[in-house]
Amino acid sequence: MAQVCDMCGKGPQFGNNISHAHNVTKRRWNVNLRPVRAKVNGATKRMRVCTTCLRSGKLVKA
């Protein structure tokens, strides 16, 4: 399952782990997603929404 917010489409960011000895390995920062039941067009729908969208009040919880 993709780590993508159903409201805003925000996905993971990619970068590097850099150790003290400057060894570099790839890593990713996932989005903080929460399963939510929300009302969309009058119907209840299960969504995976990032906490930024939850706090902004963009959706109405069912």
UniProtKB/Swiss-Prot annotation:
The coding gene here is: rpmB
This protein's record includes keyword Ribosomal protein: yes
* Origin organism lineage: Bacteria, Pseudomonadati, Acidobacteriota, Terriglobia, Terriglobales
Entry's Pfam families? Ribosomal_L28
Q: Which domain of life is it from?
A: Bacteria
- Stated name of the protein: Large ribosomal subunit protein bL28
What Gene3D superfamilies does the record tag this protein with?
Answer: Ribosomal protein L28/L24 (2.30.170.40)
**One GO term of the cellular component aspect?**
ribonucleoprotein complex
Whose protein is this, by species?
Answer: Koribacter versatilis (strain Ellin345)
Molecular-function GO term, any one: structural constituent of ribosome
Does Ribosomal protein show up as a keyword for this record? yes
GO biological process terms, alphabetically, are: translation
Q: Which InterPro entries match?
A: Bacterial_rp_bL28, Ribosomal_bL28, Ribosomal_bL28/bL31-like_sf, Ribosomal_bL28_bact-type, Ribosomal_bL28_sf
- List UniProt keywords, sorted A-Z: Ribonucleoprotein, Ribosomal protein
Q: Which family does it belong to?
A: Belongs to the bacterial ribosomal protein bL28 family.
